[in-house]
Each structure stands twice: as structure tokens, then as C-alpha cells.
A protein has these predicted regions:
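Conserved acetyl-CoA-binding loop-helix of GNAT-fold acetyltransferases
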Residues: 73, 79-92, 113, 209-222
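Active-site/acyl-donor-binding loops of N-acyltransferases
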Residues: 103, 109, 114-133, 230-282
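Amide-forming acyltransferase catalytic core, primarily the GNAT-like/NAT-type
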Residues: 116-200
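A short, well-structured alpha-helix characteristic of acyl/acetyltransferase catalytic modules
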Residues: 9-19, 133-134, 144-156, 268-278
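Flexible loop/N-cap segments at domain edges
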Residues: 187-193, 199-235
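A short helix-loop-beta-strand connector motif used in the catalytic cores of GNAT acetyltransferases and
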Residues: 28, 33-54, 67, 121, ...
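Helix-loop element at the rim of GNAT/NAT acetyltransferase active sites that forms part
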Residues: 18-30, 153-164, 223
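Conserved beta-strand in the GNAT
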Residues: 45, 51-60, 66-72, 185-194, ...
Length: 282
């Protein structure tokens, strides 16, 4: 069986989304269209006799940084080299950029052999955030803040500027994007979106634990409004305040990944990152 790897269309990716759901990755309802907006050439499918058997994404953000995700092989065809062949074909899309990924424990040794070094662990916390005792104050819809201020805040928390991603991410169908404003200044923002099971929160960027707490409560309330009392939040252990916040709301760890890179990245405000945006695109 000969594997042929080619770029995937948005229509092709509907099948990959189904694979993700089967794997328990809880894909967001509107993720694919936003992901493709960032880099429509960064999605790949491997086929045998015309049938899709593998997938991967290598999404370029700028001239220096790329992110790898969606590394999948159909379960009945694993162990035949299709995954590695797909990986090698797609990784060329990154060129000489530093590549990041969030790897599950079972694959981390393989990623190390491919030149990835661990930076920190990320734990997914899942559960039902209790309704706050009183209305959350200082949190507004993100469209009420200056777009340039929002973009600058996001850029401080991510290894690359990502305007092609950010604008649709905060406005995609079903997404609820909220900003924390303190004394007229933007001090955080977050997004919650419907997904296959629990609603997913990400990013959750904030100046302080108090700002993050207000945003988490407000985002969880928004999730209830679209029928999702339970949320899933991917929190980096590099910011210990993130786990403390999750545990204070009764969320429980579900699984963990490791953020890994092939080289240097620009500095980020790690103490502001209470939840990463997605495990698929970083």
C-alpha cells in the first residue's frame, strides 16, 4: 500500500474532526474554519488507494514560528509507517521555523527523537464551575475593547503575532469572547466555545489570578447559556496560579500533555497564561 500525502481542504478536514472526536479530543464546533484562516496550506491528509488514513497540521504563524497538531492515523492502519511518512512530508511546510507542539506522554519520546525538547507540561482540567455568588463585574464582551489593545495583549502571551487567527477566533459562531477591564485598562481576555462534549475555554490570559478568576466565572456562565454546564480548560504548569484557580472551582485534572519546541521562541508573559488557546494550534 503506497501512501500519498497532500494538502487537505476544509471539506477534507471534516473527516479529521470526526477522528478527533473518536479519540476523545473534544474538538470545537467551529474550530476548523478558524484554523484554516491562519494557514490554509498547513493541513495535510495521507491517503492509501484514495482513502484518507492519516492527518497532521503544520500551521505557520510568521517567519519564525510554526505549530504542529492533529497527528493522527486511522486506528486499523497504525504501526505501518503511515504516521511517520505523513509527519515527514508535512513538516517541510515549516521550513526553518521553530516548531511547537503539545504532545501526549506516549509520543513524547518519539518527539524528542525528532528534535523536540520539552518546555512545560499542560494539564486539562474538567468539571462544572459553580455559579458565582454575585454577578461578575469588570468583564465585558471583547468587541467593546480596542482591537489593537486586544491584539497586543494576545501577542504578549503567544510566541507569534496571529491577527489572521485572533479576529475569527473571538467572533466565530458560538464562540463567546470576554475581556477583563480594570480602571479602563485591558487586564485579560478569554474565549469559551461549544465542543463535542464539555465546552472548551481557551485562551484565558490575565494579568492577575483575580482577573483570571473573574473571567473563568464569566466564561463558565456563558457556557451554561449555550447548554454546556461542564467546561474543559488546558492549563500550563509553568503558571502555578492556573492550577490553583482550577482546583478552587472544583475542576479535576483529566490528562496532560507536554509543550515541546524544536528551537527558541520569543519571550512570552507566562504568568499571564492561565489557559492555552488550543492544544491543536498552540
Amino acid at each position: 500500500m503506497t501512501l500519498h500525502v497532500s494538502r487537505a481542504s476544509l471539506q477534507d478536514w471534516a473527516l479529521v474532526r470526526d477522528w478527533c472526536a473518536t479519540e476523545g479530543w473534544n474538538p470545537g464546533a467551529a474550530d476548523a474554519s478558524v484554523f484554516f484562516a491562519q494557514d490554509p496550506d498547513g493541513f495535510f491528509v495521507g491517503r492509501v488507494d484514495g482513502e484518507p488514513v492519516s492527518a497532521i497540521s503544520v500551521v505557520n504563524y510568521d517567519a519564525d514560528y510554526s505549530f504542529l497538531g492533529f497527528y493522527l492515523v486511522r486506528p486499523d492502519l497504525r504501526g505501518q509507517g503511515h504516521g511517520l511518512a505523513t509527519w515527514r512530508a508535512a513538516l517541510a511546510h515549516a521550513g526553518d521555523r521553530t516548531v511547537g507542539l503539545d504532545g501526549v506522554p506516549a509520543q513524547q519520546d518519539n518527539y524528542r527523537r525528532s528534535g523536540f525538547a520539552p518546555a512545560y507540561r499542560t494539564a486539562r482540567y474538567v468539571g462544572e464551575v459553580p455559579l458565582p455568588d454575585r454577578p461578575v463585574t469588570g468583564v465585558v464582551p471583547v468587541d467593546r475593547v480596542d482591537p489593537a489593545a486586544l491584539a497586543a495583549y494576545d501577542s504578549a502571551c503567544h510566541p507569534a503575532d496571529r491577527p489572521r487567527f485572533l479576529t475569527p477566533w473571538v467572533s466565530a459562531p458560538g464562540h463567546r469572547a470576554l475581556a477583563r477591564v480594570t480602571d479602563g485598562r485591558l487586564t485579560g481576555y478569554g474565549v469559551v466555545r461549544p465542543a463535542e462534549s464539555e465546552a472548551r475555554i481557551g485562551p484565558l490570559f490575565a494579568d492577575t489570578p483575580a482577573d483570571a478568576s473573574a473571567l473563568l466565572d464569566a466564561l463558565a456562565t456563558e457556557a451554561r447559556a449555550f447548554g454546556a454546564p461542564r467546561v474543559a480548560v488546558d492549563m500550563p504548569e509553568a503558571n502555578p496560579a492556573a492550577a490553583r484557580l482550577a482546583l478552587s472551582r472544583g475542576l479535576e485534572p483529566s490528562f496532560e500533555t507536554a509543550r515541546m519546541y524544536t528551537g527558541p521562541i520569543r519571550p512570552v508573559a507566562q504568568d499571564r497564561i492561565f489557559a492555552v488557546t488550543t492544544l491543536e494550534l498552540g
